[in-house]
């Protein structure tokens, strides 16, 4: 007689504005295992931690995740980059580099860039430390709430933030997985670039209102961001 399939569930709730990979990592730590073990339980030998999971998974793997999750389909989808990128690039292709999304430079479980954090956000007493979706977006350089610059590397050892290497010994996403430094102890950097912050605020406004303005004329969100990219490319060319 065959044994019935064991039922188990991810009970960790997705936090406000949390990104998909952060939720999976915290879910693994909450049940007492590494992200690698949880990923294998969900999807077998698929090397999910060697890619940019925040871009999403295919329908079959998404269904497998839903069958073991207490979260709704909509809430999980909202934690993926597609929930933002689809507004500025309708022909969204998760297999390609996406404009405005910081590339992780992934190799095995390591990433050479793309993970930014606000150290004050990690200190919240109301929620466990978690990574925000908007920290992966290219125009985000500062935390508006705390008026701090985001950091993308450990101030102690200088290595880029590597959340996929989190394990039980680290306990949460606020710990550098390379040297063990608690990022919540980092001295805040208040040296904010005001021009960059102004652009960040304007981009957020366009994204929220789903309309922008160029030369005093209304344009779609997609067109506004295309124009912004063109101007930024021109500025970089002139500076270099």
Where on the chain are the PLM-derived regions?
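Domain-exit/linker segments immediately C-terminal to small folded modules
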Residues: 144, 148-240
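A structured, charge-rich N-terminal accessory region that forms the first stable segment of a protein
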Residues: 1-114, 119-125, 129, 198-199, ...
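Short alpha-helical "patches" and their helix-cap loops
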Residues: 37-45, 135, 157-163
